[in-house]
Amino acid sequence: MNERNIIETQPERTDLPLIVIPVIVESMIEPFAANFPLLHDIARIRMHCDFTLDTDTILERTKDAEAVIVIGFHITDDILDAMTVRGHVSCFAFGGTGVASYINLPVARERGIRVCN
């Protein structure tokens, strides 16, 4: 982990898709990080090891992401627009239940955005 509390795998591999975990609760850091080797040579991962609900911070952290792992925050229509229309995100993976309460599924489907749980 560096001074900015970010765990990042294979940052030099810009040929690989980038998965971003923009926020996480402390108790989930180690379990997630323990599985990062499974994605070696498949995807780069950038995990921010803190929790915030600040929209601007979340958008800044995900600006280069192709996929976002969502833990504990809602993807409002404005965030969905910023990440998919103006950004590069093509997949949201949710770490919990009730995904339909966290993202507008019809809009995501209409845009061809993959939503996983």
Task: For the regions a language model picked out, list residue spans one by one.
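Phosphate/diphosphate ligand-binding glycine-rich loop within oxidoreductases
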Residues: 66-117
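N-terminal glycine-/charge-rich "phosphate-binding" loop or analogous flexible N-terminal tail
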Residues: 1-67
